[in-house]
Amino acid sequence: MNKVVVYVLALSILLFFGLPNTTLARVQYGSPVSRKEIGKGVWDQKVFNEIKIAVGGSDSVRAHSKDHKSNPNG
């Protein structure tokens, strides 16, 4: 019985000390009207596609060995 009381007391203390920390750690989202540049920091699908195009393929031996399937373990 004493262990249960200690566990509940410890969890409640952690809960009450943890709540202000999570409140402070939240990301504050501003409305687009309040920002100076609307769209700044917004990543749309076009930006992701440009990044995918800019990144080349892998030149590693492991990547090429999977295409040939000569090694059943690789």
From Swiss-Prot:
Superkingdom of origin: Eukaryota
Keyword annotations from UniProtKB, A to Z: Apoplast, Cell membrane, Cleavage on pair of basic residues, Membrane, Secreted, Signal
Signal peptide: 1-25
Biological role: Brassicaceae-specific phytocytokine (plant endogenous peptide released into the apoplast) perceived by MIK2 in a BAK1/SERK3 and SERK4 coreceptors-dependent manner, that modulates various physiological and antimicrobial processes including growth prevention and reactive oxygen species (ROS) response regulation. Inhibits root growth.
Tissue specificity as recorded in UniProt: Mostly expressed in roots, and, to a lower extent, in seedlings shoots.
Gene name, Swiss-Prot/TrEMBL: PROSCOOP23
Primary subcellular site in the record, as a coarse category: membrane
Subunit structure: Interacts with MIK2 (via extracellular leucine-rich repeat domain); this interaction triggers the formation of complex between MIK2 and the BAK1/SERK3 and SERK4 coreceptors, and subsequent BAK1 activation by phosphorylation.
Cellular compartment(s): Cell membrane; Secreted, Extracellular space, Apoplast
Statement: the UniProt record of this protein carries the keyword Transferase: no
Motif extent (SxS motif essential for MIK2 binding): 58-60
Upper taxonomic lineage: Eukaryota, Viridiplantae, Streptophyta, Embryophyta, Tracheophyta
Similarity-based family: Belongs to the serine rich endogenous peptide (SCOOP) phytocytokine family.
Name recorded for this polypeptide: Serine rich endogenous peptide 23
GO cellular component, one term: apoplast
Molecular function terms, GO-annotated: LRR domain binding; receptor serine/threonine kinase binding
Motif range (SCOOP motif): 52-66
